[in-house]
Design a protein with these regions (language model features):
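A short, solvent-exposed beta-strand micro-motif common in secreted/extracellular proteins
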Residues: 66-89
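Core beta-strand residues in small-molecule sensory/regulatory alpha/beta domains
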Residues: 18-22, 34-36, 86
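Beta-strand-rich domain onsets/edges
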Residues: 1-28, 48
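Charged, amphipathic alpha-helical segments
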Residues: 1-3, 9-13, 55-71
Length: 419
């Protein structure tokens, strides 16, 4: 595939880099990141450092015109950058191919291994392959959207549960050499969506596609599809079997915000307990009359279709949005209402305790009184948390904020991550 010409980079996108320790999900301050074009890795464009929260400032980077991602084009719609990350006491990390689209803020997660760990001095470079709408990937092998679940001995969950982790087999089903990755469910969905659709598309299109990705994934979880065939993973990264996942992939605020808002949702049909295996294709290189097409969903979003209208256009009128009853790996569930100034009780006390624990590792967060009363100091701490973790700075604990606080609290409280 030809390298993108830098003289076509007439627009700009943004990139923010978040650096954490792989041993524990805590930030790494004072890491330095050198940014260069992937096609010219030795010419450093910019050098940035992480703050006390392990985050860099938002960096403006040249990108191709936004029009390149709005319809199928002969022109690559994103620019590609290499990142070299260094920090005292950690092994260096190199990322090749971070993708930047016009007008969209990308978030690049970086996980570093402590220097004393008994692994090679430098990790293998993380290479981010082409986007599925730009590169060449095998088309999906068609399956029935509802799986038989009455075979003797088959493991099936009794209800739909949002898992804490997905085990991703980074290759085709039968590839014994492919690595398995433990990935938090929300991070997995954000990664897949960033691989499968362009973050510049209309919000309704992004939401419809994210719902299809989540429902497909939860069908694999609910039916224990691969485990029932003797495998030790939840899903593959092969587009022939599942959808694309790329370890280390840049994600985007426009997608991440939606995932944080709707991550417990999936797609249902009447009288069917399991999430529907909603298959899709690009609609240009591959056609799929019974499924959603990604480019087609983009044009429907342009025309003002709502997410459920886009989904019903492709999957039929009987499709509807459902919500999982249970979310794994969190201290307690969303109370069902916002916590704001004037709120009182155990849920407020729990949030105050969790914010104080997070503040031990994220020192820009203030420590607050644990009194079960949601006053100005709690609202300010929530606002600061939202600022650090890319949420709207409202000072109100809404659904996305509740679960983001839970996620970060669990991460910093654990002795070690699964991977």
């Amino acid at each position: 595939m030809p390298e993108i010409q830098t003289n076509t980079l007439v627009d700009h996108g943004q990139l923010k880099i978040q650096v954490t320790s792989r041993q524990r999900a805590v930030p790494i301050p004072n890491a330095t990141i050198e940014i260069s074009y992937t096609g010219d890795p030795d010419s450093v464009l910019e050098t940035v450092s992480t703050d006390e929260n392990g985050q860099t400032p938002v960096v403006d980077l040249p990108a191709p015109p936004v029009e390149y991602s709005m319809s199928p084009s002969e022109n690559q719609p994103y620019s590609e950058y290499n990142l070299k990350i260094h920090s005292d006491e950690y092994k260096p990390v190199t990322i090749s191919g971070a993708q930047i689209l016009s007008g969209v803020e990308g978030l690049q997660p970086v996980s570093m291994i402590p220097e004393e760990t008994h692994t090679p001095t430098e990790e293998h470079p993380i290479v981010i392959g082409p986007h599925t709408l730009w590169g060449n990937y095998p088309p999906k092998i068609a399956e029935s959207e509802i799986k038989p679940v009455n075979e003797s001995g088959e493991i099936v969950l009794s209800r739909v549960v949002i898992p804490e982790y997905i085990i991703v087999h980074d290759g085709p089903v039968g590839d014994k050499t492919a690595q398995n990755y433990y990935v938090r469910y929300k991070d997995y969905i954000k990664n897949v969506a960033a691989c499968e659709i362009y973050s510049t598309w209309p919000r309704a299109t992004l939401e419809a596609n994210i719902l299809a990705i989540m429902s497909f994934t939860l069908n694999r979880v609910y039916t224990e599809w691969y485990r029932n065939k003797g495998h030790d993973f939840t899903i593959t990264s092969s587009t022939a079997y599942d959808h694309k996942f790329i370890p280390g992939k840049t994600t985007y605020n426009s997608i991440n915000t939606i995932v944080d808002e709707i991550f417990a949702d999936y797609l249902s049909r009447p009288n069917v307990r399991q999430p529907i295996l909603t298959q899709y294709c690009d609609g240009k290189k591959v056609s799929c009359p019974e499924w959603m097409t990604q480019w087609g969903s983009k044009y429907l979003g342009d025309q003002g279709y709502a997410p459920i209208e886009i989904l019903r256009y492709y999957y039929g009128e009987s499709m509807y949005i459902n919500t999982a009853e249970q979310i794994s790996g969190i201290p307690s569930s969303w109370p069902g209402y916002d916590l704001t100034i004037g709120s009182r009780g155990d849920k407020v006390r729990q949030i105050q305790q969790q914010l104080n624990r997070i503040a031990k590792d994220y020192p820009s967060l203030p420590t607050i009184a644990v009194d079960g009363v949601y006053g100005e100091s709690t609202a300010n701490a929530v606002r600061k948390f939202q600022n650090v973790f890319g949420l709207p700075e409202t000072g109100v604990v809404d659904y996305p904020t509740w679960y983001k606080i839970s996620e970060i609290y669990v991460g910093v409280s654990r002795i070690a991550e699964l991977n």
